[in-house]
């Protein structure tokens, strides 16, 4: 009996040691030599303060955070706002850091004279002193002055679908739809334009309702209807497009199964319009976003792609 207990104890110790060794090996196999900053394709507006959300991957067992991002072309430095969202996986952390810059008056005047500020090459500094020189993708800071439409609703979902509804005082004609990140996104951004839709018209007037049950019924009916909307590549839309009463722009981010799926997108497509009096206007859509939902497997694919 004592011998059996001794054997069981020995086997238990061996099993624990083997499990520990296997765990250490797994950690080493999945370890990345440095943080992986995703490519970002973003468009933000020029203000005295500008925020950037940056996504990056780190080893799970190492506490490392972005302190700052420096863009040497324009001598701009964004600093950490002490906000970080972390999604913990088995071997990695998928992080989102928010960084901020405050521009002085001279900088604002200088940049307002430029059509666009395009940020690509970046130097990232971490809280452990590590520095990385990377191509961050393409971040566009613009100072466009828009004469826009009146938006009554804007929404987006985790599936990549988004919708914006505009209430129109007069009929308008949409002549063109453009984006400063068109070349980077036109293969997977699709749209549909709808005018004077009964549900959209009802939604515009929903604030006049006082019956909460009635409001919920209208909203449920409205959102269920979105499942049947088919979107098309922007260059296949029938333009010019005339709209009256309401204009809804439906957008679907249909990500391709290629390297783009590892990138982050927060882009703007701009509607260029003319009203019935011949006045020209432009209105950007602000809810077209995509960011990858990482699993350990997807991170390993990205690590292999980056050669780390």
Which residues make up each language-model segment?
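Non-catalytic macromolecular-recognition regions in eukaryotic signaling proteins
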Residues: 2-121, 127-308
């Amino acid at each position: 009996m004592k011998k059996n207990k001794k054997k069981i104890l020995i086997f238990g110790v061996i099993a624990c040691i083997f499990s520990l060794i296997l765990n250490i090996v797994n950690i080493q196999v999945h370890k990345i030599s440095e943080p992986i900053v995703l490519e970002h394709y973003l468009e933000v507006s020029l203000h005295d303060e500008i925020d950037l959300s940056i996504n990056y991957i780190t080893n799970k067992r190492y506490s490392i955070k972005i302190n700052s991002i420096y863009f040497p072309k324009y001598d701009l430095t964004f600093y950490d706002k002490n906000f970080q969202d972390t999604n913990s996986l088995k071997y990695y952390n998928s992080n989102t850091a928010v960084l901020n810059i405050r521009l002085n008056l001279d900088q604002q005047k200088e940049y307002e004279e430029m059509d666009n500020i395009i940020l690509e090459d970046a130097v990232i500094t971490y809280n452990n002193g590590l520095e990385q020189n990377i191509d961050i993708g393409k971040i566009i800071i613009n100072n466009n002055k828009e004469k826009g439409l009146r938006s009554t609703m804007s929404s987006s979902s985790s599936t990549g679908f988004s919708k914006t509804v505009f209430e129109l005082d007069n009929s308008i004609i949409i002549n063109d739809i453009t984006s400063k990140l068109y070349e980077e996104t036109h293969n997977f951004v699709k749209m549909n334009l709808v005018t004077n839709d009964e549900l959209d018209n009802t939604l515009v007037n929903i604030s006049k309702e006082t019956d909460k049950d009635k409001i919920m019924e209208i909203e449920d009916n409205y959102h269920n209807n979105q499942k049947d909307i088919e979107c098309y590549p922007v260059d296949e839309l029938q333009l010019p497009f005339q709209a009256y009463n309401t204009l809804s722009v439906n957008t679907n981010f249909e990500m391709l199964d290629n390297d783009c799926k590892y990138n982050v997108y927060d882009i703007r497509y701009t509607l260029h319009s003319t009203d019935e009096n011949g006045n020209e206007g432009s209105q950007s859509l602000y809810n077209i976003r995509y960011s990858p939902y990482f699993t350990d497997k997807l991170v390993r694919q990205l690590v292999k792609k980056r050669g780390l």
